[in-house]
Design a protein with these regions (language model features):
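Active-site signature of alpha/beta-hydrolase-fold catalytic machinery across serine-
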Residues: 62, 146, 150
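Loop-to-helix element that buttresses phosphate recognition and phosphoryl-transfer chemistry
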Residues: 2-59, 109-121
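Short glycine/proline- and acidic residue-enriched helix-loop micro-motifs
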Residues: 96-116
């Protein structure tokens, strides 16, 4: 059995995030100085993966000149809600929005449900179990949430907030485990 160190990093902030909108394929807003710190911290990764969207590729390029896009790391398919402001949905599709928030099987937007996203991410995590080394994957808040739910086997999907450039670490050595690194960046392995 091989050991894996998987670090999931949320892409840098986008305008859609600042405006509380469902995303489109937009670029990151800027390249914050936090990216330099993260890039240095994870420079020794054996693989750098990212979602296929522009914002994940731009962020991943801080870690590796040629990150490998992985379709399994793509954002949730928001269907007709792509680019829509949450406040507009609260006014115009309040019942649909509430159904989506409260029922992980619901996909009133015509895209992917939280359960479908979770199944996709679970399959991706299972596919990594034959790998070894340190993998950095730059992806989206919902993908990070789904990965956490797989690891902790919980149902608290909507109780997890994933900020831009947040980094969580998952390790596999027979079972997936969530590791919360401390603030001692010099001593972090």
């Amino acid at each position: 059995m091989q050991s894996i160190r998987l670090t999931l990093i949320c892409h840098a902030r986008t305008v859609a995030q600042k405006l509380a909108r469902f995303p489109t394929n937009e670029p990151v807003e800027n390249q914050p100085s936090a990216l330099v710190t993260l890039a240095t911290r994870f420079a020794s990764a054996s693989h750098v993966l990212c979602g296929p969207e522009l914002r994940t590729r731009q962020t991943a390029e801080w870690f590796c000149a040629t990150p490998q896009a992985d379709e399994a790391l793509r954002d949730c398919d928001w269907g007709r809600w792509h680019g829509q402001a949450i406040k507009d949905l609260q006014l115009n599709e309040a019942e649909a929005l509430q159904a989506w928030i409260s029922d992980p099987h619901a996909a009133p937007h015509g895209g992917e449900s939280v359960m479908q996203l979770g199944a996709r991410v679970a399959a991706w995590l299972a596919s990594l179990q034959g790998e070894s080394g340190h993998i950095v994957a730059v992806t989206h808040p919902f993908v990070v949430r789904a990965a956490l739910m797989q690891v902790v086997q919980g149902l608290a999907f909507n109780a997890i907030d994933v900020e831009p450039l947040a980094a969580i670490e998952l390790r596999f050595n027979g079972i997936w485990r969530l590791r919360l690194p401390g603030n001692d960046l010099a001593g972090a392995l």
